[in-house]
Regions:
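Short, mixed-charge low-complexity intrinsically disordered segments
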Residues: 39-73
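A short, sequence-level motif marking secondary-structure junctions
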Residues: 21-27, 51-56
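Short, surface-exposed loop and linker segments with low hydrophobicity and enrichment for Pro/Ser/Thr
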Residues: 1-3, 26-27
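Residue-level signal for glycine
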Residues: 13-14, 44
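Acidic, low-complexity, intrinsically disordered interaction modules
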Residues: 22-46
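A short beta-strand micro-motif
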Residues: 2-13
Length: 73
C-alpha cells in the first residue's frame, strides 16, 4: 500500500490537494486510476479517479515510510 499525494489543478477555484491510499496507479485514457487489490473478490477495486490532464502526483510513499515519518513528529 502506498500513499499518493496529488494536486488537482482547477481553473476557477483553489487547487485540491489530496492523499490517496492505493496499491497502484494506472493512467487510462484521460484519467488516473488508483487501485487496491481486493483479496476477497480477487480483483482490483477503484479507490480514486482523477483527470490526467489536470492532476500532478507530487509524492509517493510506502506505508512503512509513512509510519516512520509520522512516528518522528
Amino acid at each position: 500500500m502506498k500513499l499518493y499525494r496529488v494536486i488537482v489543478l482547477r481553473e476557477d477555484k483553489e487547487n485540491l490537494e489530496r492523499g490517496v491510499w492505493a496499491d497502484r496507479m494506472e493512467i487510462k485514457g484521460e484519467s488516473i486510476l488508483f487501485l487496491t487489490f481486493d483479496a476477497d473478490n480477487m480483483e482490483d477495486r477503484l479507490v480514486g479517479l482523477y483527470p490526467a490532464r489536470y492532476t500532478i502526483v507530487t509524492s509517493v510513499e510506502t506505508k512503512e515510510e509513512y509510519d516512520k515519518r509520522k512516528g518522528t513528529i
